[in-house]
């Protein structure tokens, strides 16, 4: 990210009191939480794919708005969990909601009707007594009469503190949300360095970008059956970096699919990941990828700890 881009998305600070706080983004899978956070921060800090349940752990993006620091917490989508990993992801989402100074419920208003996951989230909010604001996302994909009717329908289910209509993809309405959020943040010293954009370590970012490309290039349930780890990160004298990533698959048969004939599939995916990593880190990247079979990777306690997930959720 260039200095000019950083300045554009983080208005200049001035002398005086500072504010800082957390904004928790919750919603059904694929509501657009990661896209919104990236738009708010002005930088890609969370991976985005058309597939549901892409985000596995809580990711924090940091935006400066004058003398206010807004820390966005992108939580996994909330849905009915079936596996251990699902339960841990949903638990992390609700924990993120509890930790926020402001809670934003994102809803994909382009859907034909309110989805069951969103209805379940609203019922949980009612029981907890939590205050939440509604963000109807993807207004660019539907007609005004549709999302206005959806607004009325959702308002009858829950007394939202504030309602916004946006397109996180195009940026329409995003500034209004950011301005309002800045007003809600409590007076406080900054919680992160004002130059920081995320608390995500570079090694984890590299693994996440590779995982995003796997989701975009592999079909059906296969991407959900794999994970990516950064095995090593080596700085080179010429200023470039050598990154070794390991892709773990749950079934031996999946290994061949990921590799492709003559290794062409993983080569194509790796090239896409390398190009994006070079753009993010603004340096040359040497990316080396391995594909390994590890049947029980979903039951590895250490991996859950790395993702900031509760293994026993």
Task: Label every PLM stretch briefly.
Residues 64, 69, 91-163, 234-237:
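Conserved C-terminal guanine-recognition region of P-loop GTPase G domains, centered on the G4
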Residues 202-313:
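P-loop NTP-binding site
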Residues 2-91, 95-97, 107:
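Conserved G1/Walker A P-loop phosphate-binding module
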Residues 130-131, 140-198:
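Canonical P-loop GTPase G-domain recognition
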Residues 74, 137, 167:
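Active-site glycine-centered loops adjacent to acidic/histidine catalytic or metal-binding residues
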Residues 43, 62-66, 96, 100-103, ...:
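Conserved, well-folded catalytic cores of nucleic-acid-processing
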Residues 32, 173, 265:
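Conserved glycine(s) of the Walker
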Residues 55, 79-80, 112-113, 142-143, ...:
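Catalytic P-loop NTPase motifs of RecA-like helicase/translocase cores
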